[in-house]
A protein has these predicted regions:
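Amphipathic, hydrophobic secondary-structure cores in small proteins
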Residues: 5, 25-31
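Cys/His-enriched microdomains
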Residues: 71, 87, 105
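Short cysteine-rich clusters marking metal-coordination/redox-active sites
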Residues: 73-76, 89-92
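Short, low-complexity, polybasic intrinsically disordered segments
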Residues: 41-52
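Extended interfacial segments that mediate partner engagement and assembly in macromolecular machines
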Residues: 2-15, 39-41, 55-63, 67, ...
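Short functional micro-motifs and their immediate structural scaffolds
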Residues: 81, 94-98
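Short, flexible, mixed-charge glycine/proline-rich loop motifs
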Residues: 61-69, 78-83
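Phosphate/pyrophosphate-binding loops at sites that engage ATP/ADP/AMP, CoA/4′-phosphopantetheine
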Residues: 16-25
């Protein structure tokens, strides 16, 4: 289960962002993940909440934005969004496609309470 490893690294990034922006508590964060990462959102949420106990992110709301796989056909130039891992052009059926989206895995934003009020930080 690589979700626990991702959650642990995510919590490290959140702690760094909180320190950098003088946040005493993190209330919400947004994580963007591509379909090619094979991350199970429910497993990641469970790991995040379990590993986050006792950290600056304890009780924070984790928003996961899932990015579908998108490809461009090198034969006809069409762009398609894939529903599964069949890397075929949606227009002409060619196998020669380039992945445009779906590899993402990044912390997009962090929101929390500053030591003297409220604040927000970009990941």
């Amino acid at each position: 289960m690589h979700e626990l490893s991702i959650a642990t690294q995510l919590l490290e990034l959140v702690a760094e962002a909180a320190a950098r922006h003088n946040l005493r508590r993190v209330n919400r964060l947004r994580l963007v993940i591509g379909a090619l990462g094979n991350v199970v959102p429910e497993a990641l949420e469970f790991a995040f909440y379990a590993a986050g106990e006792g950290t600056v992110a304890a009780g924070a709301r984790l928003e996961i934005v899932q990015v579908p796989i998108a490809v461009r056909c090198n034969a006809c130039g069409a762009e398609s969004t894939l529903e599964d891992f069949a890397f075929l052009c949606g227009a002409c059926g060619a196998l020669d496609v380039e992945v445009l989206r779906g590899n993402e895995l990044y912390l997009d934003s962090v929101e929390g309470e500053e030591n003297n009020g409220t604040g927000a930080a970009d990941g």
